Amino acid sequence: MPLKGEISAQAGREFDTSRLDLRAIIDPRDLRVDPTRLFLETTQQTRLAICISDPHQPDCPVVYVNQAFLDLTGYAREEIVGRNCRFLQGADTDPEQVRKLREGIAAERYTVVDLLNYRKDGIPFWNAVHVGPIYGEDGTLQYFYGSQWDITDIVAERRKAETQRRIAAELRHRTGNIFAVLNAIIGLTSRRERDVSEFADKLSERVSALASAHRMTIMDEPDQEAVAIDDLVTGVMKPYRNRFAERVTTSGPKIELGPRSVTALGLALHELATNAVKYGALSVDAGRVEISWSREDGDVTLVWQEQGGPTVSQEQSEPVKGNGTMLIDGMIASLTGSIERDFAAAGLQAKITLPVHQPE
């Protein structure tokens, strides 16, 4: 699959006539038809889009185009002749490639660039544009020759291949991250568990939470690289909101997070929700949980606030860290984030701060 620069180089090799002396190849006396007629018939029959422009006229307008040029651009001959070829450019045409083309013309140098142009109907097309000078017998510049080789399909295939390579690399990277987290989950979950059944239940819940968070990072579009925090919170808390109805509320602006932050925050929410159901606000009928988030500079802060739950004693306010707590603290710390817990009498408040953008 040729890359962009290779396409230009290939076109340059195929269409560079800088060392071509037609008089040494064709003797007009040997032709059975008029040279002008031969030129017109040849260029009209070729499938390569060709144009000729006149640098002696203001703005170097096009003075000749062949049928392939009309077919490629969708314009009629009278809509092209008399205009500079730049009218084919549009909003997404690369200025750097245009600059390179203009410099080549100014220097009377054979130049090939890959350019995004636009048909009359507005449809963009990629083409390898070749421009070169045509000199008179006295060696002075007379015209510029231009051709356009449609490479739209080539560019599309190249981009498809690049996307597939990027997806494969991202998949390898994320798979490695997932196995690392799984290893930590298994190790920490088994550390203090003596009952196999309880261990299996906790492990299953945490792996399910990991899977739920990971699904959030699988984008619909190849170039999509972030997940809205609102979607993450809604997805993780859906089972609890279905069960506790309006006792779980969420609020906050639209903020997008990278995949690693999504995984850490998703697991943290799962642990907080599980503990709230077992020991906290969601373990009693009057309890409720408020989840809110905000952004300041490059950080996002999520606040988990429990209210109306069981009274928290002094002993409970200084708990020994459990496996889930150590897992979450470790993941958040690895992202240069922080988590603060306040076991106030009114209910637990957990404040999680993470950088919005994380190196993947």
Swiss-Prot record:
InterPro entries: HATPase_C_sf (IPR036890), PAC (IPR001610), PAS (IPR000014), PAS-assoc_C (IPR000700), PAS-like_dom_sf (IPR035965), Sig_transdc_His_kinase_HWE (IPR011102). Keywords: ATP-binding, Chromophore, Flavoprotein, FMN, Kinase, Nucleotide-binding, Phosphoprotein, Photoreceptor protein, Receptor, Sensory transduction, Transferase, Virulence. One of its GO terms (molecular function) is ATP binding. Residues 260-303 are annotated as: HWE histidine kinase domain. Residues 38-109 form the PAS domain. The keyword Transmembrane does not apply. The modification Phosphohistidine is found at residue 173. FMN binds covalently to cysteine after exposure to blue light and this bond is spontaneously broken in the dark. Its EC number is 2.7.13.3. Residues 109-163 form the PAC domain. It catalyses: ATP + protein L-histidine = ADP + protein N-phospho-L-histidine. The modification S-4a-FMN cysteine is found at residue 85. CDD domains: PAS. PROSITE patterns: PAC, PAS. Pfam families: HATPase_c_2, HWE_HK, PAS_9. NCBIfam families: PRK13559.1, sensory_box. Photosensitive kinase that is involved in increased bacterial virulence upon exposure to light. This is Blue-light-activated histidine kinase 1.
